[in-house]
Amino acid sequence: MKHVFSTSLIVSLFVIFTDAQTFQYSRGWTNGKRSSPEQTAPSRTLLPHIPLGMDKPDEECRLLIQRFLKSPCDVRLANAIVNRNKDLLRDMADDVNDGTALLYDPVPMVDTAASEDVRFKRGTPDRRLLNDGMHRL
């Protein structure tokens, strides 16, 4: 009788935890709060902690920084913020609007080759094939 009670207790707790987790993730609840339909950008979290070098940045500069912080891997953005150069920030905005800005430097990736194990494990294409396709363009 003891085994039946303990087994039924374990199974019922498992069902309760599974249903609670399914309800939590299927309804959009995270950490006890309802997730907002609006996507939370990282810039809202990071913007107050960035030293801008200006007591009150103008609205255009603030909006540009928020826009660029959505893709924080751009090294030029970090340099612009560190150097507090508003002109460089506006030039970057022009580059993004023109479609000429890169979020990363492709040169280090050209000469590196992924090992066979990693390449086949992740299903990534061979870099040599990608480079050949880029040279044809």
Curated annotation (Swiss-Prot):
Modified residues (Pyrrolidone carboxylic acid): Q21
Membership in a protein family: Belongs to the corazonin family.
Keywords: Amidation, Cleavage on pair of basic residues, Neuropeptide, Pyrrolidone carboxylic acid, Secreted, Signal
Lineage: Eukaryota, Metazoa, Ecdysozoa, Arthropoda, Hexapoda
Keyword Signal recorded: yes
Transmembrane segments: none
Biological processes annotated in GO: neuropeptide signaling pathway; positive regulation of heart contraction
UniProt modified residues of type Asparagine amide: N31
GN (gene name): Crz
GO terms under cellular component: extracellular region
Propeptide intervals in chain numbering: 68-137
Protein name: Pro-corazonin
